[in-house]
Amino acid sequence: MKTNPLRSLLIFPFLLCSHVNAEDRVAMKVLNVQKIWDAAPHNAFTDLERFNGRWYCAFREGKGHAGGGDYGKLRVIHSEDGKDWKSAALLETKGVDLRDAKLSITPSGKLLLNSCEYRVDNDNADIRNNTSVTYISSNGTDWKGPTQIADKGYWLWQTTWQAGIGYALGYRWGHRDATKLYQTKDGSEYAQLVNHLRPPGDRSNEHAMFFDDEGRAHMLLRRDNATSKQAGLALLGQSEAPYTDWEWRRLNVTIGGPSIIQIPDGRIIACVRRYAAENHRDWGSQWTEIGWINPATATYTPSTKLPSGGDSSYAGLVWHNGLLWISYYSSHNGKTSIYLAKVSIPG
């Protein structure tokens, strides 16, 4: 979620201004969708940011979604107007799969990119061989990094800033799964804030987060727990500063690739991957959509399906000039490519 001014007040716990509950009946309208990149065999896992008056989109280029010998690289592209895009940088590390670029702006005004070095040729079901890293740039073109961060084996997903401090969930995958909440002042050094943010065995992983006007943290958390349908439902979390004590509630859907944003009138929008019959493994049953999050009832209400299908999702969300701008990837036209959508949100 990207920084937005003029957020409406949220009342603890999970109570919104009265007008927010009406959003379940309001459909968001996709005004325009444009393919903005397809140079690699597989282009995926996006994020979007406005930095120094330009648009920046970051994503992975690889042979496929993942796999042995697929050493992904991170492409950063930029645009003045959101229509014409050019490459700004290509980040790569020999022998590793660089995955899931996530963008944010540090308190010092630099562009931060979170990623993970996934050693695909030296992996096992016990602990994935991951190293979380960051890159930092003053101009979006020249990048310093990679800088290794967090604990070895923990995939630190993305950084969200509040009052000069960045917060990020890190997760360890495999049979010894675990989660930690980290904090940073500069995007180069991260310290553990909370150990076991979720219980071991919960299979929590990807997250998205925003802070409301009162400084409360709100987190949308994916779970891949196959022990039961309820165990695989996404979670909504909330915490007051200093963000060491969290309250969790089950959402009503299973999701992948979570993104979340609070728009200026206080309403909360999520962009997620959905699964027909909740089947994570069937690419043919998947798509990317936007919908409403109601914290008062811990519910997600679908609104609009983006043009998408198959290997798809992992959106970046930015509110700009009264519209929601969404970067995402999809395979609905054959080749897995990067798309940019502009969406209007009725009042």
Q: What does each model-identified segment do?
A:
Residues 1-9:
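Bacterial N-terminal signal peptides that target proteins for export
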Residues 8-17:
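Bacterial N-terminal signal peptides
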Residues 19-21:
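Sec/Tat signal peptide C-region and signal peptidase I cleavage site
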Residues 23-44, 50-97, 105-257, 261-310, ...:
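Beta-rich carbohydrate-recognition and catalytic domains
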Residues 101:
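Short glycine-centered, acidic/aromatic-flanked micro-motifs in structured strand/loop junctions
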Residues 310-316:
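C-terminal structured domain segments
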